[in-house]
């Protein structure tokens, strides 16, 4: 009798994020990311964060899902609150009321790790840039927990004026990500146009 070889899954080289029940593929059509769970320019949302009003925050997620969002951005960063604790609460509770994939949006690496540890799926991570210290922090987390990472064309020198300067940062991002075992398909470039 001949030996049958195992069939391994084929890597289709697509950028995909997921919750525990839904997935979103990038690159085929526009992806609608709901950005109402973010305090930037939102007075009521800032108040909800300050008052620990989790039902208000969850309602923002539910409403965005009802209006067609495919991914929910989660940013709870305000200087006067404990971002780590709030990120933990919001990510945990959102997953109980919606099955949309989440975008973890924070500049705090501790809050990001807490969210990634709790997340049930493959998240969108917002964001990394070309600064060496930031790449190290974020790519270590992506390597450990998985995810697709939004990558910004900015580094220690700021945002380059030329396309060539931005391309150089993109190349540095891809090279550094590869050193951490992160595939190019798990990087989405934001050129900051």
Over which residues does each language-model region extend?
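Domain-level signal for soluble alpha/beta catalytic cores
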Residues: 1-191
């Amino acid at each position: 009798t001949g030996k049958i070889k195992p069939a391994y899954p084929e890597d289709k080289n697509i950028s995909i994020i997921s919750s525990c029940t839904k997935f979103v593929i990038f690159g085929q059509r526009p992806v609608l990311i709901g950005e109402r769970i973010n305090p930037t320019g939102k007075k009521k949302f800032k108040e909800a964060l300050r008052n620990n009003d989790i039902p208000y925050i969850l309602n923002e997620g539910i409403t965005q899902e009802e209006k067609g969002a495919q991914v929910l951005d989660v940013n709870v960063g305000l200087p006067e609150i404990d971002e780590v604790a709030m990120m933990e609460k919001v990510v945990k509770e959102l997953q109980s009321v919606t099955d949309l994939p989440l975008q973890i949006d924070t500049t705090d690496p501790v809050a990001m790790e807490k969210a990634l540890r709790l997340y049930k799926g493959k998240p969108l991570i917002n964001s990394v840039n070309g600064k060496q210290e930031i790449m190290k922090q974020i790519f270590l987390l992506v390597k450990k927990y998985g995810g697709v990472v939004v990558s910004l064309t900015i580094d220690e020198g700021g945002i380059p004026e030329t396309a060539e300067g931005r391309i150089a940062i993109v190349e540095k991002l891809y090279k550094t990500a590869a050193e951490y075992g992160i595939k190019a398909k798990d990087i989405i470039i934001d050129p900051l146009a």
